[in-house]
A protein has these predicted regions:
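A cross-family structural signal marking well-folded subdomains
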Residues: 1-128, 139
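Sequence context surrounding c-type heme c attachment/ligation sites in exported
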Residues: 78, 93-213
Length: 213
């Protein structure tokens, strides 16, 4: 790891395993997320690479990948996360004291590549966790999966209600019972990784859940 070529190892391994390569391709809806731009995109990727680099070079526990009480930010990323008193474009390690973030699942990179352009996706996020963290990828979805439905009143369902409808379908239930709980646990993060208390439909977010045995 002292060899400079190890930087390519970190970049490529993290890019493949964590799907960081997809950060360059995501295009959040400009009307919904007007603050998203190239500087933030680059900062997302760099934060995750630096955490991975830190765990390897400093021989830290691999548990830090999921529960680190620190991260790496520059001014642009710190502003996005609401971390005060960070100035300049260079990245530095900061402690996350009493923070809602911690580890990869609080990184804007992961939260953005597992979202749609205009909203979050508990299914994509849950699938990412099953595949990349737990090593238990779900089978492919059945064909002609229906879109998220609305309530009889015509108003959008909350994300949790929509997921419950999917689980009510026996064809969908076996996979969604595994994917939905970890995905819904990240619903307080919007489609570009900002913390929020209400969803796109203005409903109060319930991010509770229990993983099945």
């Amino acid at each position: 790891l002292d060899d400079r070529r190890s930087e390519a190892l970190i970049e490529n391994f993290a890019g493949q395993w964590l799907t960081l390569r997809n950060v360059s391709a995501v295009q959040p809806d400009e009307d919904v997320f007007p603050d998203f731009g190239e500087r933030l995109r680059q900062a997302f990727r760099r934060e995750t690479e630096l955490l991975f680099d830190s765990v390897l070079r400093e021989e830290r526990s691999t548990l830090d990948l999921l529960a680190a009480d620190y991260t790496f930010v520059n001014e642009r990323l710190a502003r996005h996360y609401g971390i005060p008193n960070i100035r300049g474009s260079h990245f530095r390690r900061v402690q996350l004291e009493d923070s809602v973030r911690g580890g990869l699942l609080g990184h804007g990179s992961i939260l953005t590549v597992t979202s749609y352009a205009n909203r979050t996706s508990p299914v994509l996020r849950g699938k990412w966790i099953l595949e990349n963290i737990l090593g238990t990828p779900p089978p492919p979805p059945p064909p002609d999966v229906p879109e998220l439905e609305t309530a009889e009143s015509g108003t959008p369902l909350s994300m949790r209600e929509a997921m419950e409808q999917h689980r009510a379908n026996p064809v969908c239930a076996s996979c969604h019972r595994l994917m939905d709980p970890p995905g819904l646990s990240l619903e307080n993060f919007d489609a570009i990784g900002r913390w929020r208390d209400r969803s796109e439909t203005k409903a109060v977010i319930d991010a509770s859940g229990v993983l099945p045995d």
